[in-house]
Amino acid sequence: MNHSLAVVVIASGVAYGTPLLYAALGELLAERSGVLNLGVEGMMLIGAVMGFWTVQRVHASTGASLAAAIGVAAVAGALIALIHAFLVITLRASQIVSGLALTIFAGAAGLSSYLGNDFNLAQNPARHQFHAVFPSSFQRWPIVGPIVFGQNVLVYVSWACVVAVSLYLTRTRPGLNVRAVGDSPAAADAMGIDVAAYRYAHTLVGGAFAGVAGATFTLAITPQWVDGITGGAGWIAIALVIFAFWRPELCLVGAYFFGALQALSPELQAREIHLGPTELWANSLPYLMTIVVLVLVSASSTRRWLGAPAALGLPYVREER
């Protein structure tokens, strides 16, 4: 069944937006604790290469191999995030400088590229990859078929994660505590909340989400390893958190919007529809988002206007009692 351009773009936008959504949810949790993580892009690339390496090396069933790959990607992302957490929480280094340094260290010209070459992963298709969960008969349904039933399991898990993160931040004691840590760490400390522990935990969880986001590229969207495969998606994810006003449900909307933009250009080309240099604009989007992010996070007045956590990007020094 041939679907309309709009349906195909939306369905592809959901798929392409899924890694953005995972990365944005992880960044949101870290920022809610007051930690700005500009190393998302590097963590995504480490997750991408380690997830792909795992699925190539684990000789098991498809489900077991993919589950192991996602687990390894999450751990790899969390380990890179641990470096960031140690630098900015324990050593109180600049969160902007640390994040940028980690992106360079682990990014397309750094550790992820070295690992990809050392493991000889380039130009090898994935032994296993995520496919659509529902049968093709469901996917042929008008409109909802490709959009809802034509997705892989990572898409459906991401929906559950949006609900879980939203409920966690608004309906649970630890979630309310982390919001207190991000808004007023001194007051949270006075109430007996361990500020450092909350910041460490949520930074590591954010890194794990970024690792899964990276593995989504190599195991679902483009089942192979290519240097810089994320293409600046980490920067878009950081911008998403800001534009979503630190709300998980709006991160979902924004992720799918940017995913649809990414899907639009190839679909237009496939249908021989020319609307100007859309590909050039799409390729420049990550760099534009980098500029936007750095401008927004550098101005305290802008952060307050957007509703950012009051202590975002600020180290906490506990007063002697």
Task: State the predicted function of each range.
Residues 220-287:
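Transmembrane alpha-helical segments in multi-pass inner-membrane proteins
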Residues 183-190, 194-197, 268-321:
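Cytosolic-side transmembrane-helix boundaries in multi-pass membrane proteins
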Residues 62-109, 257, 262:
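Alpha-helical transmembrane segments within multi-pass membrane transporters and channels
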Residues 17-26, 42-47, 78-82, 182, ...:
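Hydrophobic alpha-helical segments embedded in the membrane of multi-pass proteins
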Residues 1-24, 36, 50, 57-69:
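Membrane-interfacial amphipathic/re-entrant helices at transmembrane-helix boundaries
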Residues 147-225, 248-249, 253:
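Helix-loop-helix "hairpin" substructures at the membrane interface of multi-pass membrane proteins
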Residues 28-47, 67, 89-102, 177, ...:
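Short, non-helical or kinked segments that cap or interrupt transmembrane helices
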Residues 106-171, 271-282, 306-321:
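Transmembrane helix-bundle core of multi-pass membrane transporters
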